[in-house]
């Protein structure tokens, strides 16, 4: 699986900073039914990939159901302005836009973010990595205000997107550099992103790719004839 994941055109392919897991525990979602009741079009527009990704993430972030059978999402998105729907819609749009500009698969970017932080902008690892893609403030994060500036981060924290565009852009830059450093191999690039070593065998790369496949399944299940393009 080499640079075959690196993309062309409007759809999609695909970094050492976070040596830890800031991910909350998710149960495996049974289906994409929960997202069907939510119309994300008003929030993300008609862009088919952003829409498909938002629906997949919506289902992925459900942790349980209420007694009335209503889906309950992870805590971090329930406390922002507009609630989980606003955060999911905003981050899905940001992920799609920044990924397309970087020629990286948005579903891979989302998988990295889920694996790194559970898509929680305020997640902090034991080594101080922050943001949805967990940038280390001593390395790539030292140029990103959200990572190193506490007052700026506080101002961003309640916004649906939590100023994550700059974080995602920096993370994707690091990821692409890592893939190049590791000979164009996506799995080795992911290993470097997590550990700083191309040949590190700690299960991180396979877990990211597994998360990507899960998101694709959920997106396809919720697509209902949408024109999103999926790369398997």
Where are these regions (language model features)?
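Sec-dependent N-terminal signal peptides
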Residues: 1-20
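Catalytic glycan-binding domains that act on GlcNAc-containing polysaccharides
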Residues: 24-26, 37-232
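Boundary at the C-terminal end of the N-terminal hydrophobic targeting segment
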Residues: 20-24, 32-34
């Amino acid at each position: 699986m080499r640079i075959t994941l690196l993309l062309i055109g409007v759809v999609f392919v695909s970094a050492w900073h976070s040596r830890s897991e800031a991910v909350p525990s998710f149960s495996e979602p049974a289906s994409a039914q929960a997202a069907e009741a939510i119309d994300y079009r008003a929030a993300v527009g008609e862009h088919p990939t952003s829409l498909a990704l938002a629906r997949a993430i919506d289902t992925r972030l459900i942790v349980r159901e209420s007694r009335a059978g209503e889906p309950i999402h992870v805590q971090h998105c329930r406390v922002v302005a507009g609630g989980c729907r606003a955060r999911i819609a905003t981050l899905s749009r940001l992920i799609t836009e920044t990924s397309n500009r970087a020629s990286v698969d948005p579903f891979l970017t989302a998988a990295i973010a889920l694996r790194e932080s559970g898509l929680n902008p305020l997640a902090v690892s034991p080594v101080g990595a922050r943001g949805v893609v967990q940038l280390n403030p001593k390395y790539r994060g030292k140029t990103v205000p959200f990572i190193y500036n506490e007052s700026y981060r506080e101002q961003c924290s309640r916004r649906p997107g939590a100023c994550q565009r700059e974080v995602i852009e920096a993370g994707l830059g690091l990821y692409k550099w890592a893939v190049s450093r590791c000979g164009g191999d996506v799995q080795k690039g992911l290993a470097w992103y997590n550990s700083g070593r191309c040949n590190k065998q700690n299960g991180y790369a396979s877990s990211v790719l597994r998360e990507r496949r899960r998101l694709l399944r959920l997106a396809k299940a919720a697509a209902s004839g949408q024109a999103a393009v999926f790369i398997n």
